[in-house]
Swiss-Prot record:
Function recorded in the entry: E3 ubiquitin-protein ligase that monoubiquitinates H2B to form H2BK143ub1. H2BK143ub1 gives a specific tag for epigenetic transcriptional activation and is also prerequisite for H3K4me and maybe H3K79me. It thereby plays a central role in histone code and gene regulation. Forms a ubiquitin ligase complex in cooperation with the E2 enzyme UBC2/RAD6.
EC number: 2.3.2.27
Species of provenance: Arabidopsis thaliana
Residue ranges, annotated region (Disordered): 1-31
Pfam families named in the record: zf-C3HC4_3
GO MF, one annotated term: ubiquitin protein ligase activity
GO-annotated biological processes: chromatin organization; innate immune response; leaf morphogenesis; protein ubiquitination; seed dormancy process; vegetative to reproductive phase transition of meristem
Domain notes for this protein: The RING-type zinc finger domain mediates binding to an E2 ubiquitin-conjugating enzyme.
Protein name: E3 ubiquitin-protein ligase BRE1-like 2
GO cellular component: HULC complex; nucleus
Amino acid sequence: MENQESDEPMQKKPHLLDSVSPNSMARNSSPSHPIAKSVSFFDCDFSLLCLRLVDYEIDVDATVLQLQNQKLVQQLDLQKKQLYDVESKIQELQLNQTSYDDELISVNQLWNQLVDDLILLGVRAGANQEALNYLDIVDKKRVPPCAADETFLCRLLQVDSLDTSKSDEVVRKVEEALALRHSSTMELMGLFENTIDTQKTKAESISQSLHAVKSTEDATIQLSSINDLMKEESKNLREMIDALHVRHKEHSEQIQAYISSHSTDQSELKHLKGQLEEIKAELEENRRKLITLKMQKDAACEGHVTSPAIANGSLSPEKPVDKTKLRELKDSIDEIKIMAEGRLSELQASQEYNLSLSRQCQDIENELKDDQYIYSSRLYSLINDRIHHWNAELDRYKILTEAIQAERSFVMRRDKELNLRAESLEAANHKTTTVGSRIEVLEKKLQSCIIEKNGLELETEEAIQDSERQDIKSEFIAMASTLSKEMEMMEAQLKRWKDTAQDALYLREQAQSLRVSLSNKADEQKGLEDKCAKQMAEIKSLKALIEKLLKEKLQLQNLASICTRECNDDRGLAEIKDSQRKAQAQAEELKNVLDEHFLELRVKAAHETESACQERLATAKAEIAELRTQLDLSEREVLELKEGIKVKEQEAEASIAEMETIGQAYEDMQTQNQHLLQQVAERDDYNIKLVSESVKTKHAYNTHLSEKQVMEKQLHQVNASVENFKARIAHNEEQMKGCFSEAYKLIQEDRHLVISLETTKWEVADADKEFRWLKSAVSSSEKEYEQISRRTDDIKLELDDERREKKKLEEELMELNKELEELGSESVEAAIVRLQEEVKNCKNILKCGVCFDRPKEVVIVKCYHLFCQQCIQRSLEIRHRKCPGCGTAFGQNDVRLVKM
């Protein structure tokens, strides 16, 4: 551009150049070269040199030179104005292009955000893994090898390049691509609407079934079906979480690849910076050489030029040589000026690019450090809503468990009362059996009395026939009347005993029915408790998974935002220049088309956002109404359950009143039968047996209590060890968190990325090993607890044997004491010295073989050598771990504690 503009004034005015010598052309050609921004120091030096040479060699009229100079200055001003106008237009076009690109990027981001929102909403609504397949479409899109200003359209059309000559075809293709994308989003919306409708139908069916429930059995069946549905939903959620975890791993691998490419790009940038510094040094050396050459040339010209030749207007004999040298110098200086200007412009552009990159990095760091940015993120809000939902369900299940526990205490009291009454019924049954045997004896006596009565009647008839005495008749009549009265009394008593026996049988049947109902209720209670425990465990596992996913997603988002922006911004200088040239050439052609297309996109985006907001409002209102209806239904169910509980309590009170009346009747019967029971001698024997059995049961109860206390102590010890292991695990988790924070800090430093990642991997592996070792220790402690419980039984058996042996040893001690008394004092002292030496040897054996101070606490499993814990800890800190005794290599898992 600049060379063409500098050649135009030379072609327009040939008559001025003909009247001037070639040296004047050389002088006038230097101001005809326009510069857009500023004139460097080479122009000033060259103009001074040319003026001096021309003043010494050429005698030209001052007026002609002034006119030529004025015209050339005017041309230069015009060209500068034109250049300034062109630059202002280019800047305006660049600003429009950047604003257009920013708006396109924002529209694309909003579109992608809408698609992601729809996918996650479908996941929350209970969609299958088909919803996540839409994410693959976005992941599979690659960056096309085209200009920077055409990347969005190329990615939209999925084409490597665009033909700018046919703008109508480009617009048509863009419209088709937008229609396809709109249709895909509408399909996604339809899929999610279907899933939401299915969920609504499920909820309505559940609510209808709950309304139709009339008995407790139906309620339990419905609750089991609801639990099955909840399990299916939890399985779906787990599958979706696993799929997201797989995607998370893929993205982490891509991020690592981006980090490696970023490190290579930075090394290339450093290499280019070194080359730039070398080129700068070469330019400075060339400038110094030019200055020295100019000084030498000035000195040579002053020595060779003479004054008379200048006065007469003739030239010196060395003029052609000076002209050629001047032309060569001028050409070389022009080339050097062009190279210097190009290098300076490249350096300025690279500096501006680096400044923009540093600003973007600072903005990214500020956004990442800002907590509000994290709290306002979409993923954080979704996870927070999910956590609130699970917390609400937790509270609901806690309330249910508390109500069940309250009912449990009531049921336990009722169970105790029924057990007491059952025992009293058993005692009454025993008494009724004894009374029944007594009744049978009395019936036999009655039959014998009836036989005697018949015999007496026959005898009286015979006596009446034999004798006619009135006294004997009266006596026999009195005897018969007394016998009849006694018979009636005995029959009345028999009827009473039969009625009491029937009542006792009826009470026994009622007690059995109550026991069956109690057992059924206890089974139901256990089932509900198991279900509650399972649901609590599932909730805890889901919470732990959610927390892990939160942490990993936050780290991945930070890394992805850093890497993607740095990788997208790392372009070469040549690509940027090519893209700028193409953008300047295509700006005028695409301006009108892009403005219209941009207006259409804006209108469509506004309509779509309005429709999406209205749909979200409608869905939110529908969800609120559904939740309100569910609340009303739950309140009604609670009221119905309370009424049923009240009815059951009233029935229980009525049954208790009936039992009390029966007990009172039974007590009345006992008062009536006390006279008969006093005559029974077997009662005393039975009481003696009961006393002996009660003594035996008390003794067994005391033994069970002692065993229970021992087991509780062992459980406390095991719980203490488990708590210690939990504390170690928490400490290890804190160490893991610290390692992650250090790794995140080290990621920001580009030089130490690989080292920091390797160290964190090793630390994580060690922590996993320690965690596994702790798990194995917990399992071993559980096994030890089982072994201890077995050993206690063996020890109890051994105690009896030891007691017997103790008696034998005591007898032997008595004999030995007698022998020692017989022995002298010298032999006793010698034996004491020997025993002391043996004790010292035993103590030395129990001490560590490295330090000889501390006792042996740790064993190495490979060689079974014993040492103290501190000496082994020192060897564990060393990388090459060897046994101090035999030199065999061992690992951290080969060291075990030993109780001496």
